[in-house]
C-alpha cells in the first residue's frame, strides 16, 4: 500500500466533503443569515432598526429615517472532524466508500453548525406558554401572536424547529395534518423533511436542547440569527507509520450569533 498521497486526490476528497456539507451537513444553516469566506477571527452582522416615512415640503430636503444600525459581532472558531483510514487506496478507487467517509466528515461539521445555531437560539427569553405541557395548538397560536405583535415579517422567511416528540404532537393537530386546512401538497404524511404551515416552514430536529424533561423549540425569522464561515472546508491527509494508517482531518472555521432577540420566540415543551 502506498503511503504517498497525490495532491489531486486530496483536493477531490476535500471538494466532496465540502459539497456534502453544503448539501446536507446542516439542517439549519439555510434558515439563517449566512456569511461565507470570512477573513479573520470575527465578523459583524448588522441589526437594522425600524424606519418611518414622512412628508416633505416643496423643494425641501427628503427626511432621513435615521435607522438604528447596531453591529452584532460573531466570533469564528476552528472545528475539526478527523478519523483513521486503514486502506486509503480503496478510497481512491471505490467511489461508494469514499462518499461514506466524506459524508461522515461533512455531517460532523454540519452537526457542529446546528449546535452553534441552537446555542444562540437558546438565548431567547421570549417564551410562548409555559413549560408544563407539550406543543399544543394554544401554545402555537400564542407564539404566532407574539411574532405578529413584534412586527416580525411574515414574508415566507419564518422557520420553526421542533423536536421529534413535538413533531408527533403536531401530527395530532388537525389544522396541521389535514388536507382540509393545508391542501394535499403540504401534508406532513407525504414526507418528514419539512412542512409549511402558518406562513412558516416547520422542521424536526434531533439536536434541540432538553433540560429537565423540557425541550426548547424555536420559531424565528431568518434575519434574527446569523452563521459565518471562514474558508471552505479544508481536508488534510497524513500517513502515520506507527499506526500504519492515514489520518483524514476535515476542518472549517465557523461561528453563530443571535442578531435580533425580537425575531425569536421559544416554545418550552414538556416531554413525558
Regions flagged by a language model, labelled:
Residues 1-74, 264, 268-271:
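N-terminal "assembly arms/tails" that initiate or stabilize quaternary assembly
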Residues 86-152, 266-272:
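Alpha-helical scaffold segments that mediate packing/assembly in large oligomeric complexes
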Residues 123-193:
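Extended, solvent-exposed, turn-rich assembly/linker loops in the middle of proteins
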Residues 41-42, 155-159, 245:
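Short, surface-exposed beta-edge/turn micro-motifs
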Residues 69-91:
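Short acidic, glycine/tyrosine-flanked loop/strand segments centered on an H-E-D-like triad
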Residues 237-272:
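Extended, compositionally biased alpha-helical segments that mediate assembly or anchoring
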Residues 192-240:
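Glycine/small-residue-rich hydrophobic helix-like segments
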Residues 53-56, 169-172, 257-259:
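Short helix/loop capping segments that flank catalytic or ligand/cofactor-binding pockets
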